[in-house]
Amino acid sequence: MTPSVMDRAVLTMAAFGTGMLGAASFVWCFLFRSLFASCVLERAVDELFFWGSLCVQVMMLFFCFRKYSKTLSRYLDLICAVNIVALFGCLICLQYKMGFRTYLPILFSLNLIWLSVWLPVTFEAVYLCPPYANAYFQLGFFTATTVHYLLLSFGSVTTSFLFIPFACFLIAGLYSLRVLKKQEEFKSAILDRRAIFITRDNLYVTINFSVIPSFIGMELCVVAVMTVGFAVFMTAAGVYTDVVKVLKTYLLMFQFGTFCVGGMGYPSRKATFVYCMTACILMPLVFVLQDLTIKSVLFLAIFFLFINGVTCETTIMLAKLKKGINGPKIVLSVCLLVNICITLSLNVLYKVYIETLKK
């Protein structure tokens, strides 16, 4: 049955709202770093922000290897309520200027653990739907992060108003997730993945992780080569140029790059080649040019090309794994591994730069 225009519109809006929910853990890190940097010792905040965000992505990887859908679905409302309560707890610490070195880091860390649930849950739901919904998920993800970035850029960094959009995105995102799971296109996607021989523990076709290389081995190799290549370039740029001075600005983007590419990730190896070759042509300019602003723009452009190349490959992976109910989880695990590798390289590079300045 072909979905009507109204059905597609509802799925589009639901995917957009679900994308805002998926960005919750990254926005939480961004808010904490921006709002409380002046309240807590700078070193302590940096350590918590840098390494805490990496740990939460490792936790998301754990979710990719677990059957959690049925269990978590019963407690999503409770998890959202816990997130809101923790948010108000941090708001009280900010308002009354207390617990900056005790309660605040604890609240931040505990809430970050609970927020880590949302990206795996939303990613799996949306990426089981038709491809057009994926682009709107990415748009919602980008909107949630951009709204908070703009509020911080054009307003006071100490205002508690910044927590209001975050709470709204949580509530609206959870509602959107509920709506999305009621759509016929989502239900059809679930039915298409039902196993031929159904047992109690095997309702759907599941791709075993041991056979993944036979399905997407080439794509995994291409992604690995691109990731290593970009990490080497980033390290060289940090060592031999002064672009490292502004690398901290890119940190948030590096953490969610593979989840937000503006819909430019096409399922084509030719597109991957074009992105990679363009990036390779631009890389030497970062070492040759003198103007820091131009080099920073080029660095961001190369990162954008790298991420789109990776997304082309993950889109191909998703197409090859479309028969498995856990196909989106496998793709999510690849995206997380890329993010973790790049963010870890950036963090280490920036820490070395900070230590060098202290000497």
Curated annotation (Swiss-Prot):
Ranges in coiled-coil conformation: none
Annotated keywords: Host membrane, Membrane, Transmembrane, Transmembrane helix
Transmembrane segments: 12-32, 45-65, 75-95, 103-123, 132-152, 154-174, 220-240, 246-266, 271-289, 296-318, 330-350
Source taxon at top rank: Viruses
UniProt subcellular location: Host membrane
Main location: host cell
InterPro entries: Herpes_BMRF2 (IPR006727)
Pfam families per UniProt: Herpes_BMRF2
Topological type in the membrane: Multi-pass membrane protein
GO cellular component: host cell membrane; membrane
Keyword Transport: no
Similarity comment text for this entry: Belongs to the herpesviridae BMRF2 family.
Descriptive protein name: Gene 58 protein
Organism: Equine herpesvirus 2 (strain 86/87)
